[in-house]
């Protein structure tokens, strides 16, 4: 998976307003296991005003060149349902210091892994936004946020939908100078809390990073003399502590 894609999870939406809602959606990455079809995502509001939140879903599709594109979720062949993920409800009213949840529902075949961008965008409600509030309530809300400057931050998360018959098959090639971890399975695996540290000075460590290795892809790095590399390999519900070094 492209590094830029992994780092580009957060999107910021700036609006003019006084002290208001401050939402948080928890983890940036979520996973729908092979035996599940729904996932509860919670939205928290630590601010001092109600948050009106739109939930938008796009599918992430990789081209032949490996570059991801975000496209609208398509309808199924019968036209009566979606072929992918939908959020229910797609509009949330989250009270100050409160929490609300939306269910991410997957509909369609599970013969391969699929990826979705789920955006949680706080807005000042308008009539066309389909929030169940009256015109008077909308105006009162706008007036309460009209006396200063505030930043309302929206979040974009990544939702991995594993195939029905999820299979993990990790192949490791560890040599003196290079380490390669190849995903020969059919679903994403995670290299978590990856960092390198000096063998002679434990406090000399690099940044801690997280990597998603898609099916058929490889995570690899060149090993430097005198450094040890540590991480957790996560395959579904299994988590293994891994390390390698070049002495």
Which functions belong to the PLM regions below?
Residues 173-247:
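Intrinsically disordered, low-complexity segments enriched in serine, threonine, and glycine
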Residues 4-15:
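Sec-dependent N-terminal signal peptides
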Residues 43-49, 106, 179-187:
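Asparagine-centered strand-capping/turn motif at beta-strand->loop junctions
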Residues 73-109, 202-228:
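Intrinsically disordered, low-complexity Pro/Gly/Ser/Thr-rich segments with frequent PxxP/GP/PP motifs
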Residues 58-60, 107-166, 229-247:
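Terminal connector regions
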């Amino acid at each position: 998976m492209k590094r830029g894609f992994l780092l580009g999870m957060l999107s910021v939406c700036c609006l003019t307003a006084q002290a208001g809602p401050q939402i948080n959606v928890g983890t940036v990455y979520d996973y729908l296991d092979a035996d599940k079809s729904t996932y509860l995502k919670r939205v928290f509001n630590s601010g001092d005003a109600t948050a009106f939140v739109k939930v938008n879903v796009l599918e992430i599709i990789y081209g032949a060149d490996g570059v991801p594109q975000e496209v609208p979720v398509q309808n199924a062949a019968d036209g009566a349902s979606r072929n992918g993920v939908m959020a229910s409800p797609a509009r949330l009213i989250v009270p100050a210091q409160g929490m609300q949840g939306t269910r991410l529902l997957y509909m369609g075949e599970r013969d391969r892994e699929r990826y979705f961008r789920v955006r949680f965008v706080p807005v000042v409600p308008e009539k066309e936004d389909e929030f169940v509030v009256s015109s008077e309530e909308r105006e009162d809300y706008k007036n309460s946020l009209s006396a200063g400057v505030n930043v309302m931050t929206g979040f974009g998360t990544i939702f991995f939908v594993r195939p029905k018959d999820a299979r993990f098959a990790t192949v490791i090639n560890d040599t003196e100078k290079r380490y390669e971890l190849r995903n020969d399975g059919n679903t994403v695996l995670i290299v978590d809390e990856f960092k390198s540290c000096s063998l002679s000075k434990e406090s000399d460590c690099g940044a801690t990073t997280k990597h998603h290795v898609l099916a058929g892809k490889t995570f690899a790095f060149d090993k430097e003399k005198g450094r040890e590399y540590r991480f957790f390999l996560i395959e579904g519900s299994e988590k293994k502590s891994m390390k390698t070094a070049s002495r």
